[in-house]
Amino acid sequence: DDIAGRWRRCAVVATGNEANARHHFYGKSDGNSMVAVEVNVEQRMRGFYLELWASAPELIGVAVRSPGGTLMPAQNVPGNSHQEQEFIFDYAQVGRTRGDQLVFIRFENPAAGIWTLYVNPSTTITGQFHIWLPMSGMLEKDVVFLRPDPDVTLTVPSSAKIPIGVGGMDQKSGI
């Protein structure tokens, strides 16, 4: 934004290539039930993280079930707080004016298989939330959502306010 906002400058940036990576999940809850989000993790994965974002004033708790069936119950943790279990949860209100909620979950040496996140909104206006996995190049092995959403997969810096974000496609490979 700083460069693009200068006099007689136009910044054009790439939007990234994550639409087909299966690294974004969009969910919506009616406030009465949890939304199950399945993540497939490959063998011998050293670790990864995911970010769950909900727009203010939504407040969300997350329960996690491992591939072996162990369930860590949902905890609705307000404000800026931190919980450490077998993996790490960080709940934070983010943004100077909006106060959007970020739930940052880091998995260290996770078991291979399907992990299920149960997203449980405690305060619901729209019930909408997004979850992102890291970009493809930042993961050593394949970690994907089983029901991904290919929309809202812009990468930084294309998510800035001022620059023009452009996408491209290799017409030979279709990517």
Task: Walk through the language-model features, giving the residues of each.
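Loop-rich non-cytosolic ectodomains and luminal regions
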Residues: 1-175
